[in-house]
Amino acid sequence: MPWLLDSAIGYDVIVEEETEAVAGLALQGPTSFAILRDAGFADVERLKVFDLAEFAHDGAAVTISRTGFTGDLGYELFVPAGKALSLWDRLMAAGELRGIRAIGYTALNRARLEAGLIVANADFTTAEHAIRADRLRMPDEIGLGFMVDPEKGHFNGHRAILEARARKKLRHVLVGLEIEGNVPAEHAIVYYRKSQEVGLVSSAMWSPMAKRNIAIASLQRPYGDTIVDDLWVEIYAMRELQYQKLMKRAKIAPRPFIRLDRRTANPPADF
């Protein structure tokens, strides 16, 4: 916020803190479209992926976007905080026959990992929170380089990104891994040829949908880039109240780990 306020000086713009004023609800899963339709949000089927539109709710406006953090068909709804409870009740009533239920962070984290999505300060450290220079990551180093348009006008970091690309100074690469066995490798060290430390797993799980042991890891280039073979992870697994070290083979795996056609189907499927 201080940075935004400083940047606004000299411009005809107002910066306001609205964190407490706006409530967000995520409706995710194969029946999400049908629930919105049954809740009375007419024409919500016209929304394509990343589209958003305003709809009427309880004397106010709710912004609905076809987005989400699960890799499945889903929507996110933003409404004035005072209307959040009535919106919740409206959705729960419309979804009762379809088994709607609230989920917690553990379930959401599993879904986002299967979708290959990354989390700030979990899979990478943001510039705001990084204390050590070697913890910083450029967009290209966390798989987000495609979001940076080098032809765009000036923006913070523009020169540094172009220089790193031109001089091949990118030091890390974020990759998906498939790991042998079924023991999650969260926070495991990644080795090359079982001896040279080359990276760290930031998120990992046994995926019930992909039926694979999956992970996201940050590796030091050229590992994960031009060198992709003979990678191993060091896992410490609890065995009868004692930790046992396991060295498991890992291979580079494309993300997302699962791909659901219904996520991008137009019009959305009616489950």
Where are the regions that the model predicts?
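Conserved, structured C-terminal
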Residues: 1-271
